[in-house]
Amino acid sequence: MGIVFNYIDPVAFNLGPLSVRWYGIIIAVGILLGYFVAQRALVKAGLHKDTLVDIIFYSALFGFIAARIYFVIFQWPYYVENPSEIIKIWHGGIAIHGGLIGGFIAGVIVCKVKNLNPFQIGDIVAPSIILAQGIGRWGNFMNHEAHGGPVSRAFLEKLHLPNFIIENMYINGQYYHPTFLYESIWDVAGFIILVNIRKHLKLGETFFLYLTWYSIGRFFIEGLRTDSLMLTSNIRVAQLVSILLILISISLIVYRRIKYNPPLYSKVGALPWPTKKVK
């Protein structure tokens, strides 16, 4: 059973000495598809069609940098001994939570500079973010990484998975949980839910519900993974951050409803940066 007939090479093709990996291609596809989805919501909100260009560019750029920094920080003992590895992104090692933090900060700064309402922009892009994350997890599959603990082939067959998934979860002589698939399905389900309930939510709540939904799924799926960043010997960083995001997001939804009673997302046009009251 050790022969993998449908093994997927992580490298899609080579351009001279440069290897182009499926991981990068899939991430790019996720970002582009998310952009086009957000564009439709942008136009409906009465915002200029080019509004998202700078936001996505800077959020993606600084999100990627922050994702790497975040990973390096929690693997610091290794990188102290191997400092040249810090810049070798192609060897793997980025963290989604770090990317969210960097992308969020960059997005808010661009909103401030462009006089845009960050709550409205957050609601517009939230479904696109989780869709891109769901697509991006297939990049982990192509890299044969971010999997769960050992399982039997019989277990995978009971999930009625296609053979190409089962056979590519056979890594170094062992089958593993396809946690990339669990999270991808969870994220796509979140996308479907968010785009369908957004018009019924108040301003800002779609983004906070995105954080809540993603964090719930990430908390449980992270418990299956074998490559988690660890805070201590038994505390996984991603699970701790997920709990914090759930608590913060729900608290902000309740607080804003009590304090400001923001309008429905679907009842507002293009909004400027909030000044006196956060609406």
From Swiss-Prot:
It is a multi-pass membrane protein. Belongs to the Lgt family. The gene is lgt. GO terms for cellular component: plasma membrane. A 1,2-diacyl-sn-glycero-3-phospho-(1'-sn-glycerol) binds at R137. One of its GO terms (molecular function) is phosphatidylglycerol-prolipoprotein diacylglyceryl transferase activity. It is an enzyme of class 2 (transferase). It comes from the Bacteria. One of its GO terms (biological process) is lipoprotein biosynthetic process. InterPro entries: Lgt. PANTHER family: PHOSPHATIDYLGLYCEROL--PROLIPOPROTEIN DIACYLGLYCERYL TRANSFERASE (PTHR30589:SF0), PROLIPOPROTEIN DIACYLGLYCERYL TRANSFERASE (PTHR30589). The keyword Cytoplasm does not apply. This is Phosphatidylglycerol--prolipoprotein diacylglyceryl transferase. It is found in: Cell membrane. The keyword Zinc does not apply. Pathway: Protein modification; lipoprotein biosynthesis (diacylglyceryl transfer). Catalyzes the transfer of the diacylglyceryl group from phosphatidylglycerol to the sulfhydryl group of the N-terminal cysteine of a prolipoprotein, the first step in the formation of mature lipoproteins. It comes from Staphylococcus aureus (strain MSSA476). Keywords: Cell membrane, Membrane, Transferase, Transmembrane, Transmembrane helix. The chain crosses the membrane at residues 18-38, 55-75, 89-109, 203-223, 235-255. It holds the Pfam family LGT. Its EC number is 2.5.1.145.
